[in-house]
């Protein structure tokens, strides 16, 4: 009996119903709530699990390299990146007979394969990989790192190698090592790789371990570094006629500031990127020596925070007390980390398409669309998670005595003002944006499109002009040839930048108009409403006027019975749950906007977006309906084609999504009655009644059913859009 699942909770293990299984799974990672947990074991478990996480990541990336080397067409793709379709891996067992085999045999393969829309081919090519052997050795190296990570994780669970709590709470040492080691040495090493391997590779030189020490990355070697003539490293860059991967038109520079894109690959100059990474490395190596550890020099973070008291008195005691609050709360730290990572992931989405770093990726339209959408959805989940852990911090870790009148306490003190302002902003954005869209819909329906309300985004256009975009006719900053900013950069990076920003074939500073203005505000509505729900959930997590003792009920509770009247739906978990729907909704609008604008750009008919995006029917008809035709035609009486799998996934995604509502709309009582009826039938059916269960079947709790519903809604929503996106883009552009 003692070994029943879950072993971490004897109370749950003795539960006679199926609740034991579901609650066991739900709390498996909530180490804080486990029996016999101590602060020391909590920190050590989390630390060891990080190594397991790393092992999984290394194994997964190793698998990418291995399968492309084994079943892909990397070597033939390298010969002609623009016309050969990159293969991700083979399809072992194509169903649906000969038509399926023919439909999926492409990219020069002998049998059915999947095409890669992840951009790994472009990435590996840019960083200097050229042969299948290179890919295999990369896969082996990552496999080795994966094994090392597993060993390290196991090692740090052994008594002798378990770090103490004081080691985990040594913030200065951790910051120094992460800043210098992670963000300093890593970019420095990457600069080294770019300079020694990738840049020579882009100029037709094949540098590997066997000739690594013989090939000079720069004709003058380290001379300019030691004599202080660093500008020599920037002289003689690749010419605009350079053919990537060959010596034709190649220069000798290794660290440049050219600006703009390589004309052939439409990606940032490798020498610019090497320079960028060197600068980042320098900054963080310095930053990693700022905090006081063994030698009594440098800053103490506690002293810094305690000194942050604005003299005006309008922020009370400022940051006093924050050091211990943050350093003793894993949820606070996780919230900060997730907030940062979420923002960075969204920035990755924005920059991967506008400033592509990998050779030829800008011309692989389906990959561009897939990467943008992927990173925006990931960012959404990570950002909502930040607020979830912020709320858990307020419930489990926040100590009012330690934080009297500091910025954290003052956030709680004026939460009504914060929440009501967010509410006002959301209402304003929602009603005005919908009002404009609906007005325009009605005008088109009545045949008077000239009566639409179309607002030019003049402030955004002015900002684009300030960065050098000339098409709007604003004579300002970098688009004004007489300004000091223009003249200062003219000799170095500006020509490349101006050329790129005014070139209409890339995605840098796209021309915007009334359709962009409207969808921008629709997205702003989604962002503000999501933020409102999340912020309210965190700030009301400890208590509210309606339920002052809320923190005593924990992070997720369904209600406090009928007696209090109206305590359903107000736990911090419920706020997270509602916010995820809004987050998905908002990112839907973001990705619709990005995809439609780019489809029209790539097809050369931007007027379709400009004319149809100003009213809702335009979005429904000319984006969603028009582009789903490939999916609806994925299989027909004439047999299969290569889009059939996406057509099936589109249907399957809708099915998963719709299943979510089964959990979201009907509550416990309905399911409990149904379960009891089914159990009755089971016990009275011959043969079936030979199978017994140890746990009495009961319905999911309200909170659990919501989680299951939300999971199906989210997964179905993303599956459906992924199939739509890839099929509609690859169906047009291959």
From Swiss-Prot:
Q: List the disulfide bonds.
A: none
Give the binding site residues for [4Fe-4S] cluster. 559, 568
Q: Where does phylloquinone bind?
A: 671
What subcellular locations does the record give? Plastid, Chloroplast thylakoid membrane
| EC number annotated for this UniProt entry | 1.97.1.12
Coiled-coil intervals in this record? none
What are the transmembrane regions?
Answer: 46-69, 135-158, 175-199, 273-291, 330-353, 369-395, 417-439, 517-535, 575-596, 643-665, 707-727
Query: Entry cofactor note text?
Result: P700 is a chlorophyll a/chlorophyll a' dimer, A0 is one or more chlorophyll a, A1 is one or both phylloquinones and FX is a shared 4Fe-4S iron-sulfur center.
What residues does chlorophyll a B3 bind to?
662, 670
| A Gene Ontology biological process term | photosynthesis
Superkingdom of source: Eukaryota
Cellular component terms (Gene Ontology): chloroplast thylakoid membrane; photosystem I
InterPro entries per record: PSI_PsaA/B, PSI_PsaA/B_CS, PSI_PsaA/B_sf, PSI_PsaB
Report the top EC class in one word. Answer: oxidoreductase
SUPFAM superfamilies found in the cross-reference section: Photosystem I subunits PsaA/PsaB
Annotated chlorophyll a B1 binding sites: 654
What membrane topology was assigned to this protein in its record?
Multi-pass membrane protein
MF terms in GO: 4 iron, 4 sulfur cluster binding; chlorophyll binding; electron transfer activity; magnesium ion binding; oxidoreductase activity
Asked if Glycoprotein is a keyword of the record, the answer is no
| UniProt catalytic activity | reduced [plastocyanin] + hnu + oxidized [2Fe-2S]-[ferredoxin] = oxidized [plastocyanin] + reduced [2Fe-2S]-[ferredoxin]
Return the Pfam families for the record.
Answer: PsaA_PsaB
Assembly and binders: The PsaA/B heterodimer binds the P700 chlorophyll special pair and subsequent electron acceptors. PSI consists of a core antenna complex that captures photons, and an electron transfer chain that converts photonic excitation into a charge separation. The eukaryotic PSI reaction center is composed of at least 11 subunits.
Say which family it is in.
Belongs to the PsaA/PsaB family.
Protein's name according to its UniProt entry: Photosystem I P700 chlorophyll a apoprotein A2
Q: What species is this protein from?
A: Antirrhinum majus (Garden snapdragon)
Point out the gene that encodes the protein.
psaB
């Amino acid at each position: 009996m003692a070994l029943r699942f879950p072993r971490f909770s004897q109370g749950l293990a003795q539960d006679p119903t199926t609740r034991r299984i579901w609650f066991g799974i739900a709390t498996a990672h909530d180490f804080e709530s486990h029996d016999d947990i101590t602060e020391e074991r909590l920190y050590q478990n989390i630390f060891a699990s990080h190594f397991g996480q790393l092992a999984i990541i290394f194994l997964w990336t190793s698998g990418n390299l291995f399968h492309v080397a084994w079943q892909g067409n990397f070597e033939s793709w390298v010969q002609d990146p623009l016309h050969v379709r990159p293969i991700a891996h083979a399809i072992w067992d194509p169903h649906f007979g000969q038509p399926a085999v023919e439909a999926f045999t492409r990219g020069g393969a002998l049998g059915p394969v999947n095409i890669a829309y992840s951009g790994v081919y472009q990435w590996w090519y840019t960083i200097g990989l050229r042969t299948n052997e290179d890919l295999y050795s990369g896969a082996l190296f990552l496999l080795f790192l994966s094994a090392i990570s597993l060993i390290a994780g196991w090692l740090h669970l052994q008594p002798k190698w378990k770090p103490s709590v004081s080691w985990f709470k040594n913030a200065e040492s951790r910051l120094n090592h992460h800043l210098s080691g992670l963000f300093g040495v890593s970019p420095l090493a990457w600069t080294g790789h770019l300079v020694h391997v990738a840049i020579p590779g882009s100029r037709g030189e094949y540098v590997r371990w066997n000739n690594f020490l013989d090939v000079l990355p720069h004709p003058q070697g380290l001379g300019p570094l030691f004599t202080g003539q660093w500008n020599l490293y920037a002289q003689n860059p690749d010419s605009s006629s350079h053919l990537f991967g060959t010596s034709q038109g190649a220069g000798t520079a290794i660290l440049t500031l050219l600006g703009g894109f390589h004309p052939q690959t439409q990606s940032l100059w490798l020498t610019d990127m090497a320079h960028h990474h060197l600068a980042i490395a320098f900054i963080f190596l310095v930053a990693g020596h700022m905090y006081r550890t063994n030698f009594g020099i440098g800053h103490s973070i506690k002293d810094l925070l305690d000194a942050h008291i604005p003299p005006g008195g309008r922020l009370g005691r400022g940051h006093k007390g924050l050091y211990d609050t943050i350093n003793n709360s894993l949820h606070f730290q996780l919230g900060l980390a997730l907030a940062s990572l979420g923002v960075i992931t969204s920035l990755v989405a924005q920059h991967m398409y506008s400033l592509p770093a990998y050779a030829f990726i800008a011309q692989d339209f389906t990959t561009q669309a897939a990467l943008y959408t992927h990173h925006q959805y990931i960012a959404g989940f990570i950002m909502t998670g930040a607020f979830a852990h912020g709320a858990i911090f307020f419930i489990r870790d926040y100590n009012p005595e330690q934080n009297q009148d500091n910025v954290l306490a003052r956030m709680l003190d004026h939460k009504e003002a914060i929440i009501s302002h967010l509410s006002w902003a959301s209402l304003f954005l929602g009603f005005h944006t919908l009002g404009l869209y609906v007005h325009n819909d009605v005008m088109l329906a009545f045949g008077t499109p000239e009566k639409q309300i179309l607002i030019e985004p003049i402030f955004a256009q002015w900002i684009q002009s300030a960065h050098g975009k000339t098409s709007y006719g604003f004579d300002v900053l970098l688009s004004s040839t007489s300004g000091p900013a223009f003249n200062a950069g003219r000799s170095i990076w500006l020509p490349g930048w101006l050329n790129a920003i005014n070139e209409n074939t890339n995605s840098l500073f796209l021309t915007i108009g009334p359709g962009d203005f409207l969808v921008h505000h629709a997205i702003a509505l989604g962002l503000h409403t999501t933020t409102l729900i999340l912020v309210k959930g965190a700030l009301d997590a400890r208590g509210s006027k309606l339920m002052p003792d809320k923190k005593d009920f924990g992070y997720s509770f369904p209600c406090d019975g009928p007696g209090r009247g109206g305590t359903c739906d107000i736990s911090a978990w419920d706020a997270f749950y509602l916010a995820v729907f809004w987050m998905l909704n908002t990112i839907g609008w973001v990705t619709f906007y990005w995809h439609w604008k780019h489809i029209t750009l790539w097809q050369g008919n931007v007027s379709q977006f400009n004319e149809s995006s100003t009213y809702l029917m335009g979005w429904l008809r000319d984006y969603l309906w028009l582009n789903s035709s490939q999916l609806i035609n994925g299989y027909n009486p004439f047999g299969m084609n290569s889009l059939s799998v996406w057509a099936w996934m589109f249907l399957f995604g809708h099915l998963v999504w719709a299943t979510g509502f089964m959990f979201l709309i009907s509550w416990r009582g309905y399911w409990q009655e149904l379960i009891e009826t089914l159990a009755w039938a089971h016990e009275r059916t011959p043969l079936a009644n030979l199978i017994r269960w140890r746990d009495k079947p009961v319905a999911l709790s309200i909170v659990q059913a919501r989680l299951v519903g939300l999971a199906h809604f989210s997964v179905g929503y993303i599956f459906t859009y992924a199939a739509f996106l890839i099929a509609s883009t690859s169906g047009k552009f291959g």
